[in-house]
Amino acid sequence: MSGGLAPSKSTVYVSNLPFSLTNNDLYRIFSKYGKVVKVTIMKDKDTRKSKGVAFILFLDKDSAQNCTRAINNKQLFGRVIKASIAIDNGRAAEFIRRRNYFDKSKCYECGESGHLSYACPKNMLGEREPPKKKEKKKKKKAPEPEEEIEEVEESEDEGEDPALDSLSQAIAFQQAKIEEEQKKWKPSSGVPSTSDDSRRPRIKKSTYFSDEEELSD
């Protein structure tokens, strides 16, 4: 099969089912005809009791067709059931969507705590082995080339003057530049300057010893 699941062609509509059958019961009954992807029993919205109608989504349309031919008009627990390929009502995408039930403290079937639906006492056909959880594969990050790693390490020293090979030289060099800039932009009197000089950028002492000063507004 190509193109993924096709609910409009691989979903079997089954009616006149015994009301006592659970999702797990139907899963076990219909799995003999092919890979069952999802079982949906129609229930009363108030009482949550089965209406005797269910949709069985198979992995492929051949399994669905084999199922309808095998069980249509056949007896199941004393009831003659009807089976046919379900008619698409435009809600196929919603039907196929996986639903996650995060509350694992209660059984989905009966609402009682202490067990999950796979082991619910209401399952007429007994317990069903839970499906194996798929392991999430962690995407491995491609290792960066060694050349790039070396460049990153070297980039930490970008902007420094090669002549400043010691910390004391760097401090002296930086301080001299700061004093020189302060003299250049220092106003001649104590009166605040209203000229364009007041709007010129001032040099702020950098905490990082390099030949790149930080400008303050």
From Swiss-Prot:
Superkingdom of this protein's organism: Eukaryota
GO cellular component: cytosol; nucleoplasm; U12-type spliceosomal complex
Any one GO BP annotation for this protein: mRNA splicing, via spliceosome
Residue numbers carrying Phosphoserine: S155, S210, S216
Domain RRM: 10-88
MF terms in GO: RNA binding; zinc ion binding
Subcellular location field: Nucleus, Nucleoplasm
Keyword annotations: Metal-binding, mRNA processing, mRNA splicing, Nucleus, Phosphoprotein, RNA-binding, Spliceosome, Zinc, Zinc-finger
Zinc-finger ranges (CCHC-type): 105-122
Known partners and oligomeric status: Component of the U11/U12 snRNPs that are part of the U12-type spliceosome.
Protein name as annotated: Zinc finger CCHC-type and RNA-binding motif-containing protein 1
Species for this entry: Homo sapiens
